[in-house]
């Protein structure tokens, strides 16, 4: 069924208790708000008693670091309302009672390290392996830590061959070693005219060398939907997922049984939404989240 354009913001707002917002392409793009109406939109929803949750597949920062970004942009958001895929990796390991005497090898940035250590896990890799190299000489044998019980892979601007090989050895040679991906996002945007390789490209490299599918903890996996619903005591049918990507945000909402609202302020254009090649259709779409302010104008 084709998506309908948002015409009655009031009806949508009244139909749910909670709004889950993606961040990049919805709240901000880079280091700027999507538009000046974002703060007022969030304030309006709060004034109507709606719970707000912010969920990003970007694993480069911790929840605390994202809290700082929200404040820098002039938005009042509690850290308990923020959920990143770096946090999701730690939450997943806690949910399966990952042994604290085992270690986690991280291919990713400090956001993952921070969240894992905050949860009490021992970490290797991450930024400390950014400059490491391997000399591929005949007979070379690479040592790796046999106590690594999980490899967590996220977006990594300092991705290199050393990390690929170390992670591969852990997954292939350490019995029961888990392969966890924060997301499989293919691309992201910085300037609106170019697409940049996302964390899925790093995950793909490890998948290619290990021939093992990862456990994905970010969108569109339902792990964080289940986690958030349990944490706040929410029925998923009372949630509206708001995002700019069809194959992560909207699919995440659909997989979780939520209402879905696509905004055209990020990766997905109207042409992409309407394309006959697109098989993911949100319940509603609109240009940006400040279109929800139409309810305010209508009641003045």
Model-derived segments and spans:
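Asp-based, Mg2+/Mn2+-dependent phosphohydrolase catalytic module
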Residues: 1-23, 28-50, 59-80, 90-300
């Amino acid at each position: 069924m084709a998506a309908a354009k948002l015409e009655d913001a009031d009806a949508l707002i009244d139909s749910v208790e909670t709004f889950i917002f993606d961040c990049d392409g919805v709240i901000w793009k880079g280091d700027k708000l999507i538009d000046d109406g974002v703060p007022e939109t969030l304030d309006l929803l709060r004034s109507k008693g709606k719970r707000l949750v912010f969920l990003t597949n970007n694993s480069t920062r911790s929840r605390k670091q994202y809290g700082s970004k929200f404040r820098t942009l002039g938005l009042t958001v509690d850290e308990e309302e923020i959920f990143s895929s770096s946090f999701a990796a730690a939450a997943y390991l806690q949910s399966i009672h990952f042994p604290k005497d085992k270690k986690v090898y991280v291919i990713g940035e400090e956001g993952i390290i921070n969240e894992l250590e905050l949860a009490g896990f021992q970490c290797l890799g991450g930024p400390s392996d950014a400059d490491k190299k391997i000399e591929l000489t005949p007979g070379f044998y690479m040592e790796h830590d046999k106590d690594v019980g999980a490899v967590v892979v996220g977006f990594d601007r300092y991705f290199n061959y050393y990390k690929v090989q170390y992670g591969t050895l852990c997954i292939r040679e350490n019995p029961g070693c888990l392969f966890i991906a924060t997301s499989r996002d293919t691309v992201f945007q910085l300037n609106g005219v170019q697409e940049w390789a996302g964390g899925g490209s790093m995950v793909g490299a490890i998948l290619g060398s290990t021939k093992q599918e990862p456990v994905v903890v970010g969108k569109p996996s339902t792990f964080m939907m289940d986690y958030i619903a349990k944490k706040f005591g929410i029925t998923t049918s009372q949630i509206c997922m708001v995002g700019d990507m069809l194959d992560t945000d909207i699919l995440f909402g659909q997989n979780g049984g939520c209402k879905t609202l696509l905004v055209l302020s990020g990766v997905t254009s109207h042409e992409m939404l309407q394309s006959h090649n697109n098989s993911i259709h949100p319940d509603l779409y609109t240009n940006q989240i400040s279109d929800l302010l139409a309810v305010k104008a209508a009641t003045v």
